[in-house]
């Protein structure tokens, strides 16, 4: 772990921090491309082949039955079900307000009406990771905004748990009102959603995080379908000053570090003394933490850097973190200068896990500095905004000279004539 003043970071150290473990998919593109081509050509037969190869099971029917969903409720703790239901309510409420703040509008000027309307995509596919662990919270985060946006058909794909679906994933899908759940994962699931098979419908957009093969597949099918954004290892930047609580900072650091050996955790702090206290607390907490094998690897991707609050803000904006915690004396004042972040957590009582599960905001967020150009998953992800225009003859006359002049300048004489014929 680097512990150093921002002003003293050399070019290599700064590059390690800013260009953290970005997902390099070039080496697996031929393999993923072959999988996608096979799924496109052979449909369900290809899916069965890859499920046997990668998951070690034979599945004839990928769609989860109503009976299987009903049984799933009996297989998980009732408190987990209750927590999923409560989390769903918060997530749904947040995204409903988000949807209400999307506006259709129209201007009316001299015989020209021009505006924008809002329409959802027709079908959405939500990929939910599996493998080492299953993530029912990701079901809520992907399905809920799609349903709120008005998507007619929202389906979930997730790797099988043996020959069945993971019970918590099935329950979460039912709570979020998914229209279909399929026991299929990996690049082959992305291919099924992009091209459609006999059993799995083709969708218009694919959302949700996944491993490097899923990320590569999403990039390759983009254009055939829309996607949310590329996803990489999870990351957090925690901004601190003298007022910050070292215990809270250390625990939030470990909460991120336990995600993945490639997770990145950066702490910016305004004093060297505070930086040392935070480092000591982190090392102390690691001794009794769970998932230490993962934490000890991800800590190699981490740093504590010291600088003025302005230097810390500048570094944060360059880093563009997936999660940004501002644990300073006046977090809302710092917020005014933040340009790039996936989701922002203010003050001592807003750790990243609340956004991961229950505050209502979405946890599917851009990583690897993609927050410079992407927002997190939202109802807008599933929305199209067609523009509309209606002109009177007087309105057309008022702009006809502009249209005909520019059309003819570009050599598009029939464009010009289409206007002139209406005015003759």
UniProtKB/Swiss-Prot annotation:
This is Histidinol dehydrogenase. Pathway: Amino-acid biosynthesis; L-histidine biosynthesis; L-histidine from 5-phospho-alpha-D-ribose 1-diphosphate: step 9/9. PANTHER family: HISTIDINE BIOSYNTHESIS TRIFUNCTIONAL PROTEIN, HISTIDINOL DEHYDROGENASE HDH. Zn(2+) binds at residues 256, 259, 356, 415. The keyword Transport does not apply. Pfam families: Histidinol_dh (PF00815). The lineage of its organism: Archaea, Methanobacteriati, Methanobacteriota, Methanomada group, Methanococci. The gene is hisD. It catalyses: L-histidinol + 2 NAD(+) + H2O = L-histidine + 2 NADH + 3 H(+).
């Amino acid at each position: 772990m680097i512990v150093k003043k921002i002003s003293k970071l050399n070019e290599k150290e700064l590059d390690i921090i800013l260009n953290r473990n970005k997902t390099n998919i070039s080496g697996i593109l031929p393999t993923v491309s072959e999988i996608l081509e096979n799924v496109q050509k052979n449909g369900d037969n290809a899916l069965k082949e890859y499920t046997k190869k990668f998951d070690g099971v034979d599945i004839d029917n990928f769609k989860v039955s109503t009976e299987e969903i009903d049984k799933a409720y009996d297989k998980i703790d009732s408190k987990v079900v209750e927590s999923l239901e409560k989390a769903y309510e918060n997530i749904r409420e947040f995204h409903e307000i988000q949807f209400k703040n999307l506006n259709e509008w129209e201007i009316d000027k001299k015989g020209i009406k021009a505006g924008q309307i809002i329409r959802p995509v027709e079908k959405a596919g939500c990929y939910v990771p599996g493998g080492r662990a299953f993530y029912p919270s990701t079901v809520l985060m992907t399905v809920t905004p799609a349903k709120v946006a008005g998507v007619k058909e929202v389906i979930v794909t997730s790797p099988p748990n043996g020959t069945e679906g993971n019970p918590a994933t099935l329950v979460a899908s039912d709570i979020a009102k998914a229209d279909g759940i399929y026991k299929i994962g990996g690049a082959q699931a992305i291919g099924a959603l992009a091209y459609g098979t006999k059993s799995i419908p083709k969708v218009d957009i694919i959302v949700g995080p996944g491993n490097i093969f899923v990320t590569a597949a999403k990039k390759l099918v983009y254009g055939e379908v829309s996607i949310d954004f590329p996803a990489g290892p999870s990351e957090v930047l925690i901004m601190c000053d003298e007022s910050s609580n070292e215990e809270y900072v250390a625990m939030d650091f470990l909460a991120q570090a336990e995600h993945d050996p490639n997770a990145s955790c950066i702490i910016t702090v305004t004093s060297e003394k505070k930086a040392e206290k935070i480092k000591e607390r982190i090392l102390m907490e690691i001794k009794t933490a769970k998932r230490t094998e993962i934490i000890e690897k991800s800590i190699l991707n981490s740093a504590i850097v010291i600088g003025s609050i302005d230097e810390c803000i500048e570094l944060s904006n360059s880093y563009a973190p997936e999660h940004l915690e501002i644990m300073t004396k006046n977090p809302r004042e710092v917020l005014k200068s933040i340009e790039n972040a996936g989701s922002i957590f203010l003050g001592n009582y807003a750790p990243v896990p609340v956004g991961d599960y229950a505050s209502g905001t979405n946890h599917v967020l851009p990583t690897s500095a993609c927050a410079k150009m992407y927002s997190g998953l939202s109802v807008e992800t599933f929305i199209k905004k067609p523009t509309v225009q209606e002109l009177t003859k007087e309105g057309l006359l008022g702009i006809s000279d502009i249209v005909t002049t520019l059309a003819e300048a570009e050599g598009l004489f029939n464009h010009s004539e289409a206007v002139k014929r209406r005015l003759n």
